[in-house]
Regions:
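His/Asp/Glu-rich metal-coordinating catalytic cores
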Residues: 2-73, 78-186
Length: 186
């Protein structure tokens, strides 16, 4: 019996929010050396939390592993996907935020509005872009239809296979903008 030893780094996928709740969408893909974050949202409180403006994820794991954080990728510009960015960047350094054009403009406005002095590098992406993160991840994007223009899903190719997140989407038979790219999503 032979034993194969793999030099591939195991991949962890976890949510800091957004599962079983509406809002706080923040997902991470991590290997031995890298963390990429997909979306950084807030949740708006229910009536049982008077005086609370936003509910944000617990960033402890990211703070404890901050040197591994390589990028934040945004699927679209709704608050439950971008509203946590000012809070996240006050806890950890984010080297670069990749976002579609509309979301990038909304993020810049939000950071100005909250008077956050940190320099944040924001790079706009399109459906045709490929972004390489170290030797671990290659990220590409596909158009989706949603209630806000400029919405995308994200494909992350890893040594272990492909991870796909759709962000928020709906199948719209008469979209106002570009139609969902089902072929690229598959």
């Amino acid at each position: 019996m032979s034993t194969m030893i793999s030099n591939r780094s195991p991949i962890s996928i976890y949510a800091l929010g957004g599962l079983g709740e509406v809002g706080k969408n923040t997902y991470c893909i991590e290997d031995e050396k890298n963390i990429i974050i997909i979306d950084a949202g807030v949740r708006f409180p229910e009536s049982d939390l008077p005086g609370v403006d936003y509910v944000i994820p617990d960033y402890t794991h990211l703070k404890n592993n901050s040197t591994k954080i390589k990028a934040l990728f945004i699927t679209h510009g709704h608050e439950d996907h971008i509203g946590g960015i000012p809070f996240l960047i006050q806890h950890v350094f984010i080297p670069v935020i990749y976002a579609p054009r509309l979301a990038a403009a909304l993020i810049k406005h939000k950071l100005d509005e909250m008077r956050i002095k940190e320099k944040v590098k924001i790079v706009e992406y399109t459906e045709n872009d490929f972004i390489k993160i170290g030797n671990s991840f290659t990220v590409q994007f596909f158009q989706v239809t949603h209630s806000i223009p400029d919405s995308f899903g994200i494909c992350v190719d890893t040594n272990e296979g492909r991870i796909v997140t759709t962000g928020d989407f709906k199948i719209d038979l008469t979209p106002v903008g570009p139609d969902i790219n089902l072929g690229k999503m598959a």
